[in-house]
């Protein structure tokens, strides 16, 4: 599997680090920076599918101009950038047309409304559009993994997301990565499909633990919220750096989706967010109408809309207490890779 990954993603260095396709925030600058530093950067879905495709086109231009990717710039190569889709809201025809034109190296599929049927449909249409584009599918339960591995459209990579993750994860049936991953790995044994670990990983310690569980690579989301290239409000980013104790200060709730006017997510999913006054007051009995009015007012005050006294959505994972500052994506990757190698080396001396 390691040899296969190396041939598919020849610019990637070890350990294999991925920046997740965070909605809107994972723009072309972050994706190109991550891939340019030896990882694999994904562009996140936009407000509509066309937005993601515009980002992918911008990333393609940046890659062609970059000396880092000069050896990959032939007409036969795929774009060293991935793109993510939320299947319940994205348009597969628009996505397939753009993938055919721009040939990203990977397409990350997540959150189908109709389960495996939607995943199969998207996988087939993307493969027809661009046979070289690898299909990455995110799952968060053993049941999803079982359905996926019985499919006629097997993915090229499975991303196993633990319940510690930020953004939208399983609403009620999620499980921590350290228990979920080995069970999925046992199920997938013999399939030769690489498994990537996601959820709660923000430094070399988490990455090393995931590799010891058998992961071929690791995915970080919350850590990259504090990358300088991330498309994010300064107030939001400052709150990610400030917050600690993810067990106490984050929760899964649909409140912030609804305050922002986002409805329609499949019922299996619910986002994790840093708690602030909106959630606290909801729990105390404040009506949604009043919370909505206060939320909309907070949108007008800039960076002060975030923080413990703020009211705006701050989607982030339980690992938020491990994020201590804003750095360039390249520095984050180097730091995590070096720490992982050091920790793995130390562990090998103790067994």
Q: Can you describe what each PLM-predicted range is?
A:
Residues 2-191:
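Active-site entrance/lid segments in N-terminal catalytic domains of soluble metabolic enzymes
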Residues 165, 170-196, 202-351:
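Conserved active-site-proximal phosphate/metal-binding subdomains
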